[in-house]
Structures are given as structure tokens and as C-alpha cells.
Amino acid sequence: MNKLKIVFMGTPDFAVGCLDFLINSNHEIKAVITAPDRAAGRGKKIIQSEVKKYAINNSIKLLQPINLKNEKFINELKLINADIFVVVAFRMLPKTVWEIPEKGTINLHASLLPQLRGAAPIHWAIINGLSETGVTTFFINEKIDFGNIIEQSKLKINCKENTGQLYEKLKSRGSNLLVSTLKIIEKNDFKSIKQTNSEKLLIAPKLNKNNTRIDWKNSGQSIFNLIRGLSPYPSAWTKDEKSNKILKIFEVIFHKEKNSKENLSGTIIIKNNTIKIITYDGFLEVLELQLEGKKRMSYLEFINGYKNFHYQRLS
């Protein structure tokens, strides 16, 4: 297989796994594009992206443009003379960037497109209770996550796993798919497929304070899916009505019961060294949680410190 000259674009840890896989393949990484450094925390400490750290450690040419439409940046990209751009978890690219390479610009998306277009496909696959997801490579065009599909790889979702666990599986699966996709592009041995569009398609919007809050009017199964879909980050949350403090919940087991307890939904029961939260169709057995201002703790640690939460309501 001939070497493809690649410019890689990405920012988080998910992208690092893919970049590492590409470096150890037969291709040549000519440059890495990642997000500018940012100040974070109370001390405004400068944070570098995971991709930047990797590029520096591996002595790869690095660019951190603030404005992707900047003429100087565009010219520098053109001078690299790459065959293809590879994008994994990066910003939306302007046409002046993605149209540069001869073989196009491809993106890796952590879902089976056209399902779950958007910023958080791994989280929403679990939140929606899907039994299957996967990864997709596609050509970037004007609309986000709408380009022609090149390849896909499917993966079963365990009914008990959380987003953190699925993330690791998809990172590995995505790395392999990228190498496979580059191989068929290099040989020109593929036929890309136009994406379908339908009102029935699930979407994967950016996570925020509203869509991560637990609604205790929902079924126990849907709350269970929300909690594991948001674990370990950013976490599903609720509020204790008495103290008005936020309670983050990371791990639960759902127990379905026939007798409806709709009027008790969201009530905490601490009994026999267990924490239960009532739902209208059963209860959630809480294994790991975090009260506002406190550390993340096991259910036993919580019981030892907060027995007064027995029979309190969450909202």
C-alpha cells in the first residue's frame, strides 16, 4: 500500500487513539491541527488539548488556528500538500479548508449515520436505550454529519454499560475503521453512499443543564438509561427538595415492580444498607452518587454520612 500524506484534525482523547493508530500504519502524518490552548479553573491554568500533547511528544508539525478561515492558515495548509485531511472530534470546517486536498476530507463519527448526528452520539446512544451503535467514516460537506458515507462498523451495546465503557470500545473500533477507510481510498476501491434523511432519525445534541437533569415522572428504565448514558461525565443530576442541593447520580440498578407508586416518584428510601429511589414503575438502587460540595462516594459512604436523606424528595 502506498503512503497517503495526511493532515489530522482533532482535539480530545478520542482523537488521540485514532492519531496513534494512523501513525503506526503505513501513512505519513504531515501535520496535526488542534484547538488553541485555553485557560481553565480558578487559577486560569493553561490547558493543552490531548492531541497537542501527543503531537509534541511525537515531534509532529502542529498548528493551532483560532480562525479556520484565516488566509495565512489556509495558505499554510495548502503548502503542506496533503493527499487527504482526516477529522476526529474537531470543529466545523469551512469549505475553504475541507475542499483543499485532492482526495477530500473525511470524518470519523461515533454513530451509525444518519442516526445520531450531533455533538454527543455516544451519550445519546445509551440515553435512547439502543442495543446497537457503531462508527462511520464519511466525506465532509457543507452540512454537519451529512456527507456521503464511506464505511461503517457496528457494535452491540451491553444493556448495563455506561458511556465511559462504550467510549473506549468505539475509540478502538473507530481507529481500525479509519485505517480501513484510508486503504480503500488510496486504492480508489470504494463507492460512497448518500445519507438518507427522515423525521424518525434520532439526534445527538450537545449536552446541557436541561437535558442532563432527571425527570422523576419518567419510567425507571428511561431514568436508568439517562444515568448510565451520562456516566462518568457529565453525570445525570437532580435536586434535593429540602436543601435545594444538587445530587449527581453515577450508577444505579433498576428494579421493575408492577404496583404503581406514581405519587412517590423521586422519593429516597434508605433501609437495610441500601439507597432506593422510587419510580412509578419500580425503584432505582443507587450504587454511586455525589452530593453538591462533597466528593463522589459509594452508597455505603453516603448512608454513613447522610442518613437524614431517608424519605426526602428529589426534583
Language-model region placement:
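N-terminal beta-loop-helix "entrance" segment that forms/cooperates
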Residues: R38-N58
